[in-house]
Curated annotation (Swiss-Prot):
Species this chain originates from: Mycoplasma pneumoniae (strain ATCC 29342 / M129 / Subtype 1)
Chief place of localization: cytoplasm
Lineage, highest ranks first: Bacteria, Bacillati, Mycoplasmatota, Mycoplasmoidales, Mycoplasmoidaceae
Protein name (Swiss-Prot/TrEMBL): Putative arginine deiminase
Any coiled-coil regions, as ranges: none
GO molecular function: arginine deiminase activity
Pfam families, alphabetized: ADI
List of catalytic residues: C394 (amidino-cysteine intermediate)
Gene3D superfamilies: Arginine deiminase (1.10.3930.10), L-arginine/glycine Amidinotransferase, Chain A (3.75.10.10)
The EC number(s) this enzyme carries: 3.5.3.6
Cellular-component GO terms for this entry: cytoplasm
Gene name for this UniProt entry: arcA
EC class name: hydrolase
Pathway the protein takes part in: Amino-acid degradation; L-arginine degradation via ADI pathway; carbamoyl phosphate from L-arginine: step 1/2
Catalytically driven reaction(s): L-arginine + H2O = L-citrulline + NH4(+)
Length: 404
């Protein structure tokens, strides 16, 4: 691994990608806490893990370097100095949910250090998987089953940070249960000796909330963002200002697209994705609330200028040519078919090269529609993973794409 962040498109050949094959954290999703943990159902963990391993294998078979978040965090920790190592642990304790009392903080830290004595990887997995109170002293003083809650959404590596050109956005997630996830990216990019980002376009201390599923890099000059339940106007303004101030960037503008405010379909990439220079997959359900704006970096005020027109007109404005629009489930789909395939993230394919995508096999109508439009679909079974409300794009963060 010797590279800098380099993502200047959604469709350039994917060379290196960050993923997280889930562990104990998904074994700890209680039916009592589905809303709290942002899941639609309790998933079968062994099957979900196997599904994710298949996903990773498919990517590797396409000559894509697959980097695991656990491995990268552990490697970074081992290469960091003692001060950075201690700060990483202390920050994790600061952010723990539920909030730790001074006594419970000591217990949690001791547990992590015991895991570290086994291996750094064991410690990292414990940070992600949470701490079962039965594993520690003073269990009878702890309410609930966990001294520290798990992070079951971590396998959606798209959201905690985003690669934008040669820079990154380390995001402030909307919900508390996910906000802790950005700790790992913050630590990696501050301490890894090789992996580097030239600029930081957003940090968790910045105003508003922002998540990677709402961030798209269409080309070297254009970023597209979703204004959604998870990504706010304030956060988009912060990111726009920081890109504008970066004299080394090639980006000229941001386009913002309004996203329906539905809890199970929370990001722009659950409604609209780019498959090739002019090919887009979309859910017709987004059209009722469609709005878009343009922010030019030549404008010191970064004013939001509304774009009039339908989806085809808006995308034509963004890419400079007439788009080929591919509806979820096909042009002849009825509302039930559209709703089902939208619900199971039928737009959320990961584009690994122009007109080559990876996604769930369960979206059969969309799969057929894509192939009829000249898009190669590499499908894998993800019936359990999909219950976390995300598909292949959600489960991946590109680090390096080949320039177009």
């Amino acid at each position: 691994m010797k590279y800098n962040i380099n993502v200047h498109s959604e469709i350039g050949q994917l060379q290196t990608v960050l993923v997280h094959t889930p562990g104990n954290e998904i074994r700890r999703i209680s039916p009592r806490r589905l809303d709290d943990l942002l899941f639609s159902a309790v998933i079968e963990p062994d099957t979900a893990i196997q599904e994710h391993q298949t996903f990773c294998q498919l990517l590797q078979e396409q000559n894509i370097e697959v980097v695991q978040l656990t491995d990268l965090t552990a490697t970074t920790f081992d290469k960091a100095n003692a001060t950075a190592q201690n700060q990483f642990i202390e920050t994790w304790l600061d952010q723990a949910e539920p909030k730790l009392t001074p006594e419970h903080r000591k217990v949690a830290k001791q547990y992590l250090l015991e895991q570290k004595a086994k291996s750094t990887l064991s410690m990292v997995r414990s940070m992600m998987g949470g701490i079962d109170k039965r594993k520690v002293a003073a269990a009878n003083t702890i309410n609930g089953d966990f001294l520290v809650d798990p992070m079951p959404n971590l396998y959606f590596t798209r959201d905690p940070f985003a690669s934008i050109g040669h820079g990154i956005s380390i995001n402030r997630m909307k919900y508390l249960t996910r906000r802790r996830e950005t700790l790992f990216a913050s630590f990696i990019f501050a301490n890894h000796p090789i992996i580097a980002a030239r600029k930081f376009y957003f940090k968790p201390i910045d105003m508003g909330t922002i998540e990677g599923g709402d961030i798209f890099v269409y080309d070297q000059q254009t970023v597209v963002m979703g204004l959604s339940e998870r990504t706010t106007e304030a956060a988009i303004n912060v990111l726009a200002k920081k890109i504008q101030q970066d004299s080394s960037t090639s980006f000229k503008r941001i386009f913002v697209i309004n996203v329906p405010q539905l809890p199970n379909l929370m990001h722009l990439d659950t409604w609209l994705t780019m498959l090739d220079r002019n090919k887009f997959l979309y859910s017709p359900n987004m059209l009722a609330v469609l709005k878009a704006w343009r922010i030019d970096f030549t404008d010191p005020a970064l004013k939001w200028n509304e774009i009039a027109g339908d989806l085809s007109t808006i995308l034509h404005t963004i890419i400079g040519q007439k788009p080929m629009l591919i509806p979820i489930a096909g042009a002849d789909a009825n509302q039930t078919e559209i709703d089902i395939e939208t619900h199971f993230d039928g737009t959320n394919y990961l584009t690994i090269a122009p007109s080559v995508v990876v996604g769930y096999a369960r979206n059969k109508l969309t799969h057929q529609t894509l192939e009829a439009a000249g898009v190669k679909v590499i499908a894998f079974k993800g019936n359990q993973l999909s219950l976390g409300m995300g598909s292949a794009r959600c489960m991946s963060m590109p680090l390096v794409r080949k320039p177009l």
